């Protein structure tokens, strides 16, 4: 496990088949974040009859993001197997793309983090809250910590990175 050090680049990802949030950190400091959005009206039209193509495009977009930032550390939300096997299969392809990048890259660390783990690390009490309430907590945490208004996809990726930094510095 790579400990945050000088000149260290970290990329955290909250992946899905249609919207994947990402956050980039240098030397344990937040720098930039965004969302790969394949859920726009234009994209829905493009992928209407071909969901496999959407997954391929998401995998390529995530790969290109990894190539652009060349992280020393990759933090990604751990896949929770659900009853929806199709969703699990699709998400495993996106996560597999990230894992492949890690395998093929020298001096890169890969860390899977559970949502309960990063929420706990950042002091977010998840308790018996519903999914939408948990997403809102993440959005509010980013607003209060970084002064940045973001979507839940982006806020989750930022929080994952911040939690990793807190855990290993």
Regions found by a protein language model. Name each.
Residues 1-169:
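Phosphate- and other anionic-substrate recognition elements at nucleic-acid/protein interfaces
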């Amino acid at each position: 496990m790579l400990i945050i050090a000088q000149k260290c680049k970290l990329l955290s990802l909250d992946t899905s088949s249609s919207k994947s949030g990402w956050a980039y950190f240098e030397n344990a400091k937040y720098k930039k974040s965004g969302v790969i959005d394949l859920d726009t009206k234009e994209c829905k039209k493009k992928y209407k009859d071909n969901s496999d193509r959407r997954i391929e495009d998401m995998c390529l977009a995530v790969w290109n993001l990894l190539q652009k930032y060349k992280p020393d550390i990759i933090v990604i939300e751990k896949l929770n197997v659900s009853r929806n096997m199709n969703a699990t299969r699709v998400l495993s392809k996106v996560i597999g793309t990230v894992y492949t990048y890690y395998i093929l890259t020298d001096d890169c660390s890969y860390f899977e983090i559970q949502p309960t783990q990063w929420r706990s690390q950042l002091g977010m009490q998840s308790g018996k809250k519903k999914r939408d309430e948990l997403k809102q907590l993440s959005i509010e945490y980013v607003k209060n910590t970084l002064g940045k208004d973001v979507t839940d996809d982006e806020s989750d990726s930022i929080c994952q990175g911040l939690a990793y930094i807190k855990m290993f510095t």
